[in-house]
Amino acid sequence: MFIRSNRRAKIVATVGPASSSPAILRSLFLAGVDTFRLNFSHGSRDDHAAAYRHIRALEKELGTSIGILQDLQGPKIRIGVLHEGRLQLTKDAEIRFVCGTEPGRGLMDIPLPHREIFAAVKPGDDLLIDDGRVRVRALGVSDEFIDAKVIVAGPISNRKGVNLPGTVLDISPLTPKDRKDLEFGLELGVDWIALSFVQTARDMIEARSLVSDRAGLIAKIEKPSALDEIDDIVALSDAIMVARGDLGVEIPPEDVPGRQKELIRACRIAAKPVIVATQMLDSMVTSPTPTRAEASDVAGAIYDGADAVMLSAESATGAFPVETVEIMSRIIEKTEKHKFYRPILEATEPQIAHTPPHAVATAAADVALALKAPVIVAFTVSGTTASRISRARPPLPILALTPSEQTARQLGLMWGVVSLLSPTVDTYEQSVDRATQAAVQTGLAEKSDQIVVVTGFPFATAGSTNNLRVTQAG
């Protein structure tokens, strides 16, 4: 049995060429990874299937539950092939986007094989090329072309990405490739599906119709239009990822920190986990130590109340994947122990509508704190009871006992929660007995310690959080 209780916030790490071997995956997990991410923008299905098998073997070896997150590529918009493969755009130059894959007749004609863009763009709209390095503004639009003026100059080359801030495209959030990858991931048994480039709440409805309850659904927030519908998107999702890379291209960079705080708050109100992602320790792709700004960025996300922070290239292709996880874990631990951490967390606690389940969860945190209990034990089928207690951010571990293997794995994203597979209980007394035993078996409490036990009645009913008891461990 492996139990990690040295910190509350979680770590997500991306698997790639630098980290796909069984030995490195084991080292990453022991260094602090709680959930592994399979990025389907890169690598083959065989690569991802092999990583999946290695993680599940590690899970069995250590007697623990490890979450696996499948990140779908999404509908990436790209220009086509240029006349000479490369084009230098100068400020105020006029260019023409041509609908199709082939270059137009003129040297300044840029193929754009996405007819939905020509239907959506209006004069005055901006188009960003190559992650925002080049910016052009639409002057005139037809079904076959967009005439534009260069606002920010720079070079472009074949198949560079295009972003359209503020423009909602009439496209599915799932490409044909995504749909095949999705079915592949669900057949493997991934625990989370992350949906890229979510534009509206409708995108989540479409994805849910395919995923159902076979995995948790994560909305990646990287479009301004998603920010406009964030409450509905959170309601339709099981978790949120603050994907700051593309989001920082489509909105001004100075707006990203505030938006990050807003998204974390929205998820905390809804009692759903939120992951802060992108370039958190990016310099560690090539360096054994992070910059001080990167350390502050990780700490800032923890002070904001994020459930998890994520590594991308750092663990997938970097030279120091294990060291990166170790440093990230130490930053989280140090931040959570700082004298300002609790006051900041409590000062930013959102006001939640008073319902019996919320009242019981909040009371559990308050009672545990007053009694100096070492752990709160929660019985949960769907994970909802544990998530409600997690929302209260108690300064002690939450031991979630669940009969569901999927729930145990998914709780690897939830702040402060340690999950343990446990048989379904039939009576209230059985639940208390099991809680007291598990608290000691996991090392989270000692015999005779007072612990707080939270259950729901009727038993094995998802979402019923209505009972609290103080008892002795042992």
Swiss-Prot record:
Substrate binds at residues 37, 245-246, 278. Induction: By tartrate. Mg(2+) binds at residues 222, 246. Pfam families: PK, PK_C. The record marks 220 as: Transition state stabilizer. Keywords: ATP-binding, Glycolysis, Kinase, Magnesium, Metal-binding, Nucleotide-binding, Plasmid, Potassium, Pyruvate, Transferase. ATP binds at residues 39-42, 78, 160. It comes from the Bacteria. Its EC number is 2.7.1.40. This is Pyruvate kinase.
